[in-house]
Amino acid sequence: MRALPPYSYVPGHEHPHPVTDPLGHLYGRTHAAPIPPETLAQLPSEPASRCQGLPSLLATTPQWRYALDLFNEGFYWESHEAWEAFWHALGRTTSEARFVQGLIHLAAACVKIREGRPEGVRRHTQRARTLLGDLGAASRGGVGAHAATLGLAPESISNVIRELEHYRTECWHTSKTPVVRVLSADLRLAG
């Protein structure tokens, strides 16, 4: 696993903004495209064929695995940023990109837990559920099929969504410690 940042950014807490503050852990870094455009161009454009090549491509992409590690280790703002790069690389409006946008909303919901903002948690979780679709729909060709298309285990995503939907306010993690994991569920690669 690649080294994790020294803190998980939470807006309004004492840690500096990772990108805009000179003391931020990402300040001054330039980010290459998570998937080089020429690699994406080699994938077939026909959806069924594309779905067969994308999981293996992502599973071997260090940035994709790192984004999952960030989320699973409690670096929600950072995973949001990492997935946003994939969202752009996958075209923002493709079905795969919309699925990644759902993952972005899961990370945003976790940031809202750290901020102590229940309405934000509810809103982002609801949006994630809409974008991620029926995760049991893989066999029916539904949006949930993109969990497998992107190399993720659908049940792991379902577990995260369920946990967010049932998050109790007495469990708010507004601690200002460098990293606080708010979920017990992890996102996992399929297989």
Model-identified regions with their sequence ranges:
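N-terminal alpha-helical interaction modules that lie
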Residues: M1-E78, W83-L90, A137-G191
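Generic structural signal for well-ordered, non-membrane alpha-helices
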Residues: W77, E81-E84, I104-A107, Q126, ...
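Short, solvent-exposed positions on alpha-helices
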Residues: W77-E78, A97, E119-R123
